Amino acid sequence: MPEEMETQPAEVETFAFQAEIAQLMSLIINTFYSNKEIFLRELISNSSDALDKIRYESLTDPSKLDSGKELYIKIIPNKNEGTLTIIDTGIGMTKADLVNNLGTIAKSGTKAFMEALQAGADISMIGQFGVGFYSSYLVADRVTVHSKHNDDEQYVWESSAGGSFTVRPDSGEPLGRGTKIVLHVKEDLAEFMEEHKIKEIVKKHSQFIGYPIKLMVEKEREKELSDDEAEEEKKEEEDEKPKIEDVGEDEDEDKKDTKKKKKTIKEKYTEDEELNKTKPIWTRNADDITQDEYGDFYKSLTNDWEDHLAVKHFSVEGQLEFRALLFVPRRAPFDLFENKKRKNNIKLYVRRVFIMDNCEDLIPEYLNFIRGVVDSEDLPLNISREMLQQNKILKVIRKNLVKKCLELFEELAEDKENYKKYYEQFSKNLKLGIHEDSQNRAKLSELLRYHTSASGDEACSLKEYVSRMKENQKHIYYITGENRDQVANSSFVERVKKRGYEVVYMTEPIDEYVVQQMREYDGKTLVSVTKEGLELPEDEEEKKKREEDKVKFEGLCKVMKNILDNKVEKVVVSNRLVESPCCIVTAQYGWSANMERIMKAQALRDTSTMGYMAAKKHLEINPDHSIVETLRQKAEADKNDKAVKDLVILLYETALLSSGFTLDEPQVHASRIYRMIKLGLGIDEDEPIQVEEPASGDVPPLEGDADDASRMEEVD
């Protein structure tokens, strides 16, 4: 334990790590990871965030910087003591911050990161889950954090990761403001204290950090000694040597005087060397920047361990001037749609000065996966969040960013392989955009990809669907459901597919919201095959047959409606079924079965809407099916026949299930099925099966078992 802790034991407080954090630290310490170097990237990134915070606060209150004007990050390796120190002059942490942020309150990403690690994910993902600090234990067996916040005294946090940590007042060297992290580096990892290694890591991961990163380096220089110092040194040397008398000594001395030179010695000294002198990449000309430079900047900006998928670098000039650099990541973060998550990942700068990184009005929520920077020449430096909401300049910037993002997606769509990767990760965002962004709905609809009854394993665009439409086809047919197999085998698509029309398969819950907003595409109406009023092109003969069927089955429809009463709004003859006897369709503007399922699954649903949105069900019967034809004959013979009533209810409930609805009383339906099974097995409903209770613990043989056994012997 450090000396301060021994001299002031009363002031030392010990805390236990929250269980998930202790688990995570154990995982980090006890598992071998080859890329341990990412610890430095994470600590520098945290320092940069702390500097961002104090700079932002100082824009509205310059006195916040009285405790230290210069904003920088400093790295000090000390091989003699076996430590690596990272200092920043950021906002610092109060005692409560140290206790909460470094141990007792788990971040939302702690558990998710551990699960990802155990599933084989890369340790370098750690920063994306908000737990980057703990990567210190990849290289250190003890970590000490000194921190000073403007609103509190200076404190020290320390832990050797044994399940607990201590916090105490810091009586050591005052920091002014900021944080000093001292890593007590493991003996076998001394390379991380080497100057060349630190430079290599910073260049690789952090060269685009917006604050100076200084490394304390040890150098040598030659120092000239003055005549007096040289004489003194020479005298000391001569005093040590035995003196030998020489006859020609005086003559030699005269010669030496003429050749006397100033003596120099080598001395060691330390100085700070700035490691990231590169000017902000977004201010440079896009033609001069290589893909590798974009990749390095993206990784330093996002802490992502993978390369970006696409990049858009542009500037807008004229009445309004700003530059932007936008990236599409290769994969979606684990918490993309969490409410507590920041609404966007764009850093806002004003004339190269960082302002904020969670400006909600900068980009719409559906584009919250886009990473990058925007640097405005026109916004005031001391702008607050409240002022930004009203700012007209910001609205113009937002409009341009959306436009450029859509351009970027269109460019990406030209490369099928890359677009497939992008779509797998971010299709929900595009669909959310169709629901929320009416201005860009048409452009976003071009970016959608769906599997269809004719597309095989490849998803296709709506444009491709339209190009394959039959001559007499006026509508785009679609079906919503839980998965491809379910919708492909649905009774609703039977007739449509048989006629040779293509059906779009929409299998994500968000698709239900998409079709509510996107009523048409390229002048073609989107028509659900699960809703009433499905009209398929017909010739005169088909029309005539349909009219005849309506008349023929009118009586059965009335009987079925009377039996089902208010369970259905009406019973009609279907034009969409081929192999199934019946199906349940919904009203044109009501919920589909899939939407009803989604709404029932909402934890905070509004039950008042369930009634009027979900009630309008229509039962459609297939006039060409033998079950329906036989049922018609039975109903016409005796419409009060109990068997007809039972069969109609059973048909209705089965149709509910096959059409994607849930049953309100599944047990009653099960009882009906069991009754049908009994009938099939010839069991009389009225004869109860006698089961005698066994007298002892032994189970007696069932009635007839002995006979069965003897019969089995005969067979043998």
Curated annotation (Swiss-Prot):
UniProt feature, compositional bias: Acidic residues: 225-239
Positions bound to ATP: N46, D88, K107, F133, R385
InterPro entries on file: HATPase_C_sf, Heat_shock_protein_90_CS, HSP90_C, Hsp90_fam, Hsp90_N, Ribosomal_Su5_D2-typ_SF
Cystine crosslinks: none
Pfam families per record: HATPase_c_3, HSP90
Intervals of motif TPR repeat-binding: 712-716
Lineage: superkingdom: Eukaryota
Ribosomal protein found in the keyword field: no
UniProt-recorded Gene Ontology molecular function terms: ATP binding; ATP hydrolysis activity; ATP-dependent protein folding chaperone; unfolded protein binding
Keywords: ATP-binding, Chaperone, Cytoplasm, Nucleotide-binding, Phosphoprotein, Stress response
Annotated region described as Disordered, given as residue ranges: 221-263, 688-716
Subcellular location as annotated: Cytoplasm
CDD domains for this protein: HATPase_Hsp90-like
Signal sequence, renumbered to the chain: none
Assigned GO CC terms: cytoplasm
Entry keyword annotation includes Nucleotide-binding: yes
Annotated family: Belongs to the heat shock protein 90 family.
Functional description taken from the UniProt entry: Molecular chaperone that promotes the maturation, structural maintenance and proper regulation of specific target proteins involved for instance in cell cycle control and signal transduction. Undergoes a functional cycle that is linked to its ATPase activity. This cycle probably induces conformational changes in the client proteins, thereby causing their activation. Interacts dynamically with various co-chaperones that modulate its substrate recognition, ATPase cycle and chaperone function. Required for piRNA biogenesis by facilitating loading of piRNAs into PIWI proteins.
Subunit structure: Homodimer.
Record remark: domains: The TPR repeat-binding motif mediates interaction with TPR repeat-containing proteins. Interacts with shu.
Designated name of the protein: Heat shock protein 83
Species this protein is from: Bombyx mori
Taxon lineage: Eukaryota, Metazoa, Ecdysozoa, Arthropoda, Hexapoda
Underlying gene: Hsp83
